[in-house]
UniProtKB/Swiss-Prot annotation:
Native source species: Solanum tuberosum
The entry's keywords: Electron transport, Membrane, Mitochondrion, Mitochondrion inner membrane, Respiratory chain, Transit peptide, Translocase, Transport
UniProt record, GO biological process: proteolysis
SS bonds (residue pairs): none
EC number: 7.1.1.8
Listed name of the protein: Mitochondrial-processing peptidase subunit alpha
Entry-linked Gene3D superfamilies: Metalloenzyme, LuxS/M16 peptidase-like
Amino acid sequence: MYRCASSRLSSLKARQGNRVLTRFSSSAAVATKPSGGLFSWITGDTSSSVTPLDFPLNDVKLSPPLPDYVEPAKTQITTLANGLKVASEASVNPAASIGLYVDCGSIYETPASYGATHLLERMAFKSTLNRSHLRIVREIEAIGGNVTASASREHMIYTYDALKTYVPQMVEMLADCVRNPAFLDWEVKEQLEKVKAEISEYSKNPQHLLLEAVHSAGYAGPYGNSLMATEATINRLNSTVLEEFVAENYTAPRMVLAASGVEHEEFLKVAEPLLSDLPKVATIEEPKPVYVGGDYRCQADAEMTHFALAFEVPGGWMSEKESMTLTVLQMLMGGGGSFSAGGPGKGMYSRLYLRVLNQYPQIHAFSAFSSIYNNTGLFGIQGTTSSDFGPQAVDVAVKELIAVANPSEVDQVQLNRAKQATKSAILMNLESRMVASEDIGRQLLTYGERNPVEHFLKAIDAVSAKDIASVVQKLISSPLTMASYGDVLSLPSYDAVSSRFRSK
C-alpha cells in the first residue's frame, strides 16, 4: 500500500517538474532560490518556480514616492464688491465643510429683540422663500450631508458638511437658508415651544446657569445679554422681530463664507453669483464691553453647591499675547471631575488636579474656564462641592488664583507640559475639516485675515512664567465676579472674597 502511494507521488512530482520547465523554459527570470509550494508541503521537496520579490516586473510603472514634506495648503481669500469675504483651504480629503459666518450675536440684541439669536439658532434650515422645510431636509438627505447652526455672543454660524462633489448644492443651500428665511408663523410658534422646553431644561443645569450668571453679573450692557431667551422675553418674539433683526445685522460686510477641502477658484465661481447681490451697507459699530464685576446667588435645595469666581480679560483676542498666555494658563491649571467617565489619565498632572481634586475628597469638580471675545473676556475657576464644604472650597479657589500670580509658584516642568498640551490640542482640533472651516471664518471676522497655525504655536512657545504671573496679576486686580447655586447662604460674602484678592 505504502509502496503504491510512493510511486504515485513520484509520478506526480515528475509531471509537475515537467510543467514548470515547460512554462519557464524561455524566461531568464527563473528563481535561483527555491521556495515552498503545495507539492513541497506534501512531498517535502522544493520548487524553484517563484519569482523573487526584488525582480522588476515588465510593463509595470511605479508611482513616484511621496515627498518627505508637503507644504500645508494656504488659505485663499477673496473680498467681493459688496464686502463679503469668501475664503477656502484645499485638502485631499474627499469631503468638504462649508460655513457661513455672520458677525452677529446676542451682544447686538436690543430690548425689543432679546432672545432673537436663540430663536434664530432654532429656526436655521427651516422654510425659505424658495423651499419648504421638508424639501430642505430631503435635499440634505439625498447627498448624505450634515447641517448645523450655532449662536454665540458675537457670531451666528451655519455649516454644511458633505462630499466635495456636492459643493455647488451646499453653497446654494446655505445661501438660500441664510438669505431668504420665510419665518412662517406656525414654524416660529413651533420653535418657541421648543425654546421654552430648553429654558426649563437649562434652569436645572447649574454649570450652564453659572456661565450665564458670570456674564450677566460681570458686564453692564450688551455683553451681559443672555444667550438663552428668558420667560420674560420669549413672549415678545415673533416672525416680525426676527425679520427686522436679520435685515439689520445680516449684511454683506459682516459675513464670511469659509470652506475647508475646496479649491478656491471653483468655490468662488459657485459663491459669487449667489452672494454678490447682497446689499453693501455701513458696518454697525461693535458694542463696547463694560465690565463692572458683581455677585449672583441662587439659593436652591440641592445636594451640591456650585460656584464660580471670574475676572475680566481686557483686550480679548485682539490682545494676542495676553490671550495666548491665558490659553496656556487654562491648560496649566486644568482640573476636571473627581470621576472621569472616559477613563483615568486626562489632565491628571494639571495644578488643580494635583493640588485640589487629589487633596480634597469633598470637592467633586474643580476646573479653570475662560470665555474670550474680540475685545474682552472672562477667566476664572468653577467648582462643585458638598454643601458643608462650600466656604473652604471658595477659599481654595482664591488661593489657587493668587498662587499663579507669583512666577516662583509656576514650575517650569508644569509650564512646558501645559504649552505642549496647548499646541497638541490646537493641532489635533485643526485636523477636523469642520474646525478648520470655523477657524477660517472666525479669524476673518476677528482679524480680517487668517494667521497660519505656526503663528500661534510660536506665540505659545514664547509664554514664560513671568508672562503667566503678569497676566494673572492684571486679572485679579479687576473687579471680582462671583456666581453660586445651591446652599449659597453658607458661602462667604462677595466683599469678603473680593478683599482677599486686594490684600494679596
